[in-house]
Amino acid sequence: PIAKAAAQQALLLDNQLAEAHISFASILMLGEWDWENSGNEFRIGIELNPGYATGHHWYAEWLLFHGRATEGLQEISLAAELDPISTAILKDQGMAFYYTRQYDKAYENAIKTLELNPDFITGFRLKSLSLQATGKFEEAITANEQWGKLTGDPVKTELSLAHIMATAGKKEEALSMTRAIVADQKLGNNDYRSIGQIYAALGNIDEAFKWLELSYIRREEALCNMKLDPKMDPLRDDPRFDALVKKIGL
């Protein structure tokens, strides 16, 4: 509410300020899932200042949330051209490659990001995801451990490891890890979505949707990636998948 009020106040003072429109759009998108108005605000901001890299960066997220992969890639690539040394943009361009199954390009962006900043937390996350997607599980685990050391969040690190184990065929180990985390009752933001994805990888579709519904109730930001996220692939043929996408408003 404070950030939204600040953005609205900035627009009242100067409604030609591109940065204010972009900030307001991001709040509407991630904080309220107001897709129509956030999209309008992004487009206004970009029209006011086409050279504002952050505008193209965040609008790319909006497009990718909607499954508009080609347009999303174009926007994030434009952001990278405008600000080639932004680790956040490089990482999210890598995530766009990941969402569009261009895993080698995703890995390249992870390496570029970490070359610019060796301690950039989500650079290791992107590296782990891209390695996992290409079946390089041991390397993915190493990158996941590096990510976990920097985040200081053992729950997210363990959930990510459990998903790697599930996709590597170590299903009993993955299930045991997941049940232990749930029993510990220390779940945080986006963890319910992660558990749903683990159960999807394990082939337990009913349990997966149970956790994704809990993620929806908690309005977890990461759930908005479900239209393109490869980890959702085991669920796409189930009618509950499209029903959940519709509930989110995408």
Could you describe each region identified by the protein language model?
Residues 8-17, 51:
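Flexible helix-coil transition and linker loops at the boundaries of alpha-helical arrays
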Residues 47:
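N-terminal/domain-start segments enriched in small and hydrophobic, helix-friendly residues
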